[in-house]
């Protein structure tokens, strides 16, 4: 068993780490990734440089920690579709999933903006982590589409190609959600519009 002092020390360490991360997020948002130095992070967090290095060994390590928090939250927003009898209509479920994903990303607007708009100039380790996330997301979309075909919910198609097209659309829709004036109603409209476009296309419905 751990004693009270150990628990308090652990809590204090977690609080200090969170303090550094929250301060770093504001600095990255204001200066961008490459415009930020360790000195900027130390000053913003209000800690000694030695204290900073007890938690993170570089600016990159801080950004990767922030990135991981964002990716975990985004993955948590993406749920599977319920195909049981009595479940909500497929379209409504997909809209809810996309809306939750966009809302989560927009809720971390500063970090999401850096990741998606500065991705090509970020450090290699950061780029690799973003690519891993993109690869996992593409695989999830493709797998979901395959399941949809197998269950008769979707027509036969190339799920890998469709996944690339859907992910590209998600990224561009996400860009729209990063505007400071984007509201929950805007996100809902974007989610519904994108789902309608991908599931139903632009042609009028075929009538018998």
Residue ranges and their predicted role:
Residues 46-56:
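Short hydrophobic/aromatic patch on the recognition helix
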Residues 56, 63-70:
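Alpha-helical DNA-contacting segments of helix-turn-helix folds
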Residues 65, 79-110, 162-166, 188-191:
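Hydrophobic alpha-helical connector segments
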Residues 60-62, 179:
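A secondary-structure capping/hinge motif
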Residues 1-4, 99-103, 107, 139, ...:
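C-terminal peripheral helix-coil segments that are non-catalytic and often amphipathic
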Residues 72-79, 104, 124-150, 160-164, ...:
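Amphipathic alpha-helical packing segments from all-alpha helical-bundle domains
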Residues 56, 117-122:
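Short helix-capping/turn signature of helix-turn-helix
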Residues 1-31, 36-47, 61:
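Basic, helix-initiating cap at the start of DNA-binding domains
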């Amino acid at each position: 068993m751990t004693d009270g002092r150990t628990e308090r020390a652990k809590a204090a360490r977690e609080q200090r780490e969170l303090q550094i991360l929250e301060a770093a997020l504001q600095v990255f948002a204001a200066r961008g990734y490459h415009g930020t130095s360790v000195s900027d992070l130390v000053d913003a967090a209000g800690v000694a440089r030695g204290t900073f290095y007890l938690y993170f060994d570089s600016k990159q390590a801080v950004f990767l920690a922030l990135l991981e928090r964002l990716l975990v939250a985004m993955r948590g927003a993406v749920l599977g579709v319920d195909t049981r009898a009595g479940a909500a209509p497929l379209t409504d479920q997909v809209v809810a999933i996309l809306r939750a994903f966009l809302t989560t990303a927009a809720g971390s607007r500063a970090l999401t903006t850096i990741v998606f708009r500065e991705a090509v100039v970020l450090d290699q380790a950061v780029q690799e982590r973003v690519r891993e996330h993109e690869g996992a997301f593409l695989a999830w979309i493709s797998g979901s589409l395959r399941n949809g075909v197998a269950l008769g919910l979707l027509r036969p198609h190339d799920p890998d190609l469709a996944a690339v097209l859907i992910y590209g659309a998600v990224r561009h829709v996400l860009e729209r959600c990063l505007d400071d004036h984007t509201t929950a109603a805007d996100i809902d409209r974007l989610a519904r519009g994108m789902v309608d476009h991908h599931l139903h296309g632009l042609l009028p419905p075929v009538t018998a």
